[in-house]
């Protein structure tokens, strides 16, 4: 049986929120089977639990933000991406501020923390969302699409008309069966442009951003002294974000995802469109591991290594 997964032990980390710039302490705790990923704001008079679900997403400006009764948890996508990439089904995420810490701007620190704590299999079948019909959403020349696929594959293309980005690959594809999330996706950092910083900060965004937690570009070049971690780091980060955004479906996907010029808003629209069209997907479990797609078993074995 392909089993659900949680953490072996508690994980603690602290940092600043990318957009709010406020220090935040985060604790990840093991959770029982079928709990899912649940964020808990512990800084309030009464703790508020917000499940990581697509229909709980409110603001999608520059990040994915969950909201319940006016209580928010923002910039969840990098942590969600790490949890998805490592096949973690159930975890409590305690926060004492309204944002997940940005750490280095990628998913790699979260991957390191989770792997350090250890991954524990649980005595319950892992549930997948298997896409059975093509679903597409569009916004002008931007689009995102799900298609049936016996595994999990993501393809993304970007257009920024910037010299540094134009020099990098602007298309990338990741198949969980063939490529390592940890090695080839998790280290890709978020990126931003100096000319946008003033506008963002006037609107209460990017207050905690800097060279230590993002790729920063001026009009011509990357300002980070160490340069890029991947030749295609910009588009790889878009894939990293998409993996996190789409994990708000509540289960890992069996599907091919593709997008052109997409982002958090379009990813959330696609997830909601899929959930609303119930004839386009089904829940799949595998009581016998050998009956699962070979790529899925390879991915899960690799993620637990």
UniProtKB/Swiss-Prot annotation:
Q: Which Gene3D superfamilies match?
A: lpxc deacetylase, domain 1 (3.30.230.20), lpxc deacetylase, domain 2 (3.30.1700.10)
Q: Which GO terms describe its biological process?
A: lipid A biosynthetic process
| Enzyme class (EC, first level) | hydrolase
- Listed pathway(s): Glycolipid biosynthesis; lipid IV(A) biosynthesis; lipid IV(A) from (3R)-3-hydroxytetradecanoyl-[acyl-carrier-protein] and UDP-N-acetyl-alpha-D-glucosamine: step 2/6
Record has Metal-binding as a keyword: yes
- Recorded GO MF terms: metal ion binding; UDP-3-O-acyl-N-acetylglucosamine deacetylase activity
Q: Where are the transmembrane segments?
A: none
Keywords, in A-Z order: Hydrolase, Lipid A biosynthesis, Lipid biosynthesis, Lipid metabolism, Metal-binding, Zinc
Please state the Enzyme Commission number of this protein: 3.5.1.108
Record-annotated residues binding Zn(2+)? 78, 237, 241
Q: Which family does it belong to?
A: Belongs to the LpxC family.
Identification of the protein by name:
UDP-3-O-acyl-N-acetylglucosamine deacetylase
* Organism, as annotated: Dechloromonas aromatica (strain RCB)
Gene designation per UniProt: lpxC
